[in-house]
Amino acid sequence: MLVQFMLKNVLSFKEETVLDMTAVQAYKEHESNLIDYGTKEKFLRVAAIYGANASGKSNLYLAVRYFQQIIIDSLNSGMVPAIKEYYIPFSFEEHHENSEFEISVITEDFEYRYGYEYNAEYIAAEWLYRKNMNTGRTSTIFERTSGTVEFGASVRKECEVYKEQIPSETLVLTFFNKLKLETTVFRSVYSEIMNMLVVPTDLCEDRGILERFLPDVIDLEKGKLMEFLTAIDAGIKDISCDDRDKRMEFTTTHMGKDKNRYFLDLYSESEGTIKSILLFI
């Protein structure tokens, strides 16, 4: 669950900017949108971002995608390193400084604070801390500067042997998520970050969001999805996915007046239906 997302010197955001999902104490109107972990703070399940034209809404969406994509691709040996491809600092400066991201998430009774600082050449800094939600105690998982990685006691024995193998352009989180380790901390944080979803108002034009999340929903929660589609009167009787041709395709089933079944490509459904499915995800 997302608690905070911070970015600095990315796209149009020169100064540190924070998206905070902590609910204010006076928030009483929609208690079903609150998550209560038994702590002093409660957290929003969903937040909507409004603003004037050119105020940064689309760039916030892009920044989240860059943050996630660097984590996904920083170990891949492509033609262009991920940090170079997604290093897009504030433009109106003669000398570009490092870009920075940080996220706080809660999973399995722990709050994790993870972030990294980077430029087009290397990872300048990276860190991961874990706070026990029951005791309030915070411990270091790892801290990285441009030349060294220091591990906390909980992972040091298992991870120390790999520290010299981590390339300067690769994130520690990405590196250890790829390995089969006894500790689950890297996989837990990686999964929570990948589950963070920022939906733009023109989301119907972005098939990547559906292709990434909808197959798992169809496989694991199809019954709930169909109940939801019935409740909003979408007219959809079934939904399926197929990637046999190396391209994810979604098909919806409708019942005609003649009681025959008719099949429709999901992207031929109305914008409202597609947006509703994305909100369900």
What do these predicted regions represent?
Residues S12, T107-E111, K257-K259:
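Glycine-centered tight beta-turn/hairpin loop motif at sheet-sheet or coil-to-beta transitions
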Residues I83-Y86, I236-M248:
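Long, charged, glycine-rich C-terminal linkers/tails
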Residues M1-L7, S12, F228-K237, M255:
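N-terminal accessory segments
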Residues Y37-K42, A48, A52, Y61-R113, ...:
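Conserved P-loop NTP-binding catalytic core
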Residues R113-C241:
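Electropositive, glycine-dotted interaction segments
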Residues V46-Y50, R244-I281:
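Conserved ABC ATPase signature
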Residues L2-Y66:
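Pre-Walker A-like glycine/lysine-rich segment at the N-terminus of P-loop NTPase domains
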Residues F5, F101-I103, I123-R130, K246-G256:
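Short polybasic amphipathic segments
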